[in-house]
Amino acid sequence: MKLLGISGTLVGTKTCILVEQVLVEAKRICPEVDIQLLDLKDYQVEFCDGRQQSSYNEDTQKVIELVSVADCYVIGTPIFQGSITGALKNLFDLISPQALRHKVMGFVANGGTYQHYLVIENQLKPIASFFRAFVAPGSVYAHTDHFNEKNELVDPEVRERVAQLAWEVVHMHWSLKSGGVHAHR
């Protein structure tokens, strides 16, 4: 099982920290999980303009490939202006819908306003629905106050939600792949 964590921003560190913590927890729960972090700020991803994948630059092709071959995902975004980042939306636009179909997604987000947790419900989950992906029932939203001055996640309730999300993603993936849903198709 390949679990890909996606930090869907070009700035800041809190989103990446949240995604990494879910990955680490998933590995703790299930040591055979192959975890990988895709931090969009490490790549020069071109804007999606509808051309063939092979005509994008090397970084863009690599990112598309990493997303396409993963079995399940933890996807993170900061909330800017009440929405997901343009970088994350661009990534979704680059990915073929078939690449994400019937795969499990878990979502994390962070921001400076407590009400922005609704972006997970109102934007990320509908995107997952478009891709016909399975979504973990829980999610993690962390406010700036949940981190200390060193950007370490210190809030115990948020840390518990991180652990719960990791458990849900791992167990949903294994349950779906063990024959439950796919055995009856």
UniProtKB/Swiss-Prot annotation:
Query: What EC identifiers does the entry list?
Result: 1.5.1.45
The subunit field of the Swiss-Prot or TrEMBL record says: Anthranilate 3-monooxygenase consists of a reductase component (GTNG_3158) and an oxygenase component HpaH.
Record-linked InterPro entries: Flavoprotein-like_sf, FMN_Rdtase-like_dom, NAD(P)H-dep_FMN_reductase
Q: Which GO terms describe its molecular function?
A: oxidoreductase activity, acting on the CH-NH group of donors, NAD or NADP as acceptor
Write down what this protein is called.
NAD(P)H-dependent FAD/FMN reductase GTNG_3158
**Key word Mitochondrion present in the record?**
no
Which reaction is the catalytic activity of this chain? FADH2 + NAD(+) = FAD + NADH + 2 H(+); FADH2 + NADP(+) = FAD + NADPH + 2 H(+)
Q: What does this protein do?
A: Involved in the pathway of tryptophan degradation. Reduces FAD/FMN to FADH(2)/FMNH(2), which are subsequently used for the hydroxylation of anthranilate. It can reduce either FAD or flavin mononucleotide (FMN) but prefers FAD. The enzyme has a slight preference for NADPH as acceptor.
Biological processes, Gene Ontology terms: anthranilate catabolic process; L-tryptophan catabolic process
The alphabetical list of record keywords is: FAD, Flavoprotein, FMN, NAD, NADP, Oxidoreductase
Q: Can you name the source organism? A: Geobacillus thermodenitrificans (strain NG80-2)
Enzyme class name: oxidoreductase
